[in-house]
Amino acid sequence: MSFLWEDRAWEDYLYWQVQDKETLKRINALVKDACRTPFSGLGKPEPLRGNLSGYWSRRINEEDRLIYLYENGQLKIIACRGHYED
């Protein structure tokens, strides 16, 4: 499976590289797991609703979520900092 980073998600990822290595490790583990099993596994995956219908969320920590879209065998990472309401 391939994956790609939206611009915002990549900026988030670069932020974590500087700010918090433990959070970065958690994000890496979540991305790896989402590539293997997009709809189950680490971080309590849950489908989003409303204007984010079709997207999925996994918990990085209490405040931050990994938001992604799985489509046609590709994982598209939308954000990895903040919450989906942000």
Locations of the language-model features?
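Generic structural signal for secondary-structure transition and capping sites
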Residues: 36-39
